């Protein structure tokens, strides 16, 4: 017949695997480049020949993983600036990610960009511009639900412009998240909110 000590040892032996497993950290979800996103942005813009003007707009964007490291990217944005200026911007390109460690990536993108400006006076004459964009960013999942990202972007569309970007994202579920972002450039400062579906 087993005594109390033997029973106690058996209970401890049975609990050890459970306790060890509970102490091991839960792996964070991997960073995904398969997503569709809708964002709203507003900010101050400086156009050549004008004082600073305010504006806001919507952007629909998406990314799709082609391989483990490569992804395709596309976006369309429509912005309304005061003084009755309407700006449509298309972007299409490809990106490459390099994992620094688990849940920390650096990635870059090369983009072809088309921008159409429709407005009164001198803006009507600058209706269509094509150019290139370069992005370099670091992306990090800091917890199960929180993600941060920052980097630099250079656009050469009509005029050349370099911007610093920073954003934070909260993951409500594995598929749905919301974020905020800020852009600081020589002629544009903007703030935005977004909703993203990851697939």
Which sequence ranges carry the predicted segments?
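Cleavable N-terminal export/targeting peptides
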Residues: 1-32
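Short glycine/proline- and aromatic-enriched beta-strand/turn motifs that initiate or cap beta-hairpins
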Residues: 21-80
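Residues that define the transmembrane beta-barrel architecture of outer-membrane proteins
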Residues: 32-34, 54-58, 86-90, 114, ...
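Repeated loop/turn-to-beta-strand initiation elements of outer-membrane beta-barrel proteins
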Residues: 34, 68-74, 101-106, 140-150, ...
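Membrane-embedded beta-strand positions of outer-membrane beta-barrel proteins
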Residues: 36-38, 62, 72-74, 94, ...
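Transmembrane beta-strands of outer-membrane beta-barrel pores
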Residues: 40-46, 66-68, 76-82, 98, ...
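Detector for outer-membrane/organellar transmembrane beta-barrel domains
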Residues: 89-91, 95-97, 101-153
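Outer-membrane beta-barrel "beta-signal"
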Residues: 166-171, 175-177, 188-199
């Amino acid at each position: 017949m087993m005594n109390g000590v033997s029973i106690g040892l058996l209970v401890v032996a049975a609990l050890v695997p459970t306790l060890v497993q509970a102490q091991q950290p839960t792996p964070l979800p991997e960073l995904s480049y398969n997503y569709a996103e809708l964002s709203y942005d507003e900010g101050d813009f400086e156009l050549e020949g004008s004082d600073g003007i305010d504006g806001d707009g919507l952007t629909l964007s998406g990314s799709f993983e082609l391989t483990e490291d490569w992804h395709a990217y596309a976006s369309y944005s429509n912005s309304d600036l005061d003084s009755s200026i309407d700006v449509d911007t298309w972007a299409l390109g490809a990106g490459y990610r390099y994992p620094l460690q688990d849940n920390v990536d650096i990635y870059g993108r090369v983009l072809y960009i088309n921008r159409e400006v429709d407005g009164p006076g001198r803006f009507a004459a600058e209706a269509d511009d094509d150019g290139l964009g370069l992005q370099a960013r670091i992306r990090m999942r800091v917890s199960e639900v929180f993600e941060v990202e920052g980097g630099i972007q250079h656009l050469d569309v009509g005029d050349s412009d370099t911007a610093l970007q920073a954003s934070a994202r909260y993951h409500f579920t594995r598929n749905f998240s919301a974020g905020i972002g800020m852009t600081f450039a020589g002629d544009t400062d903007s703030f935005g909110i977004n909703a993203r579906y990851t697939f």
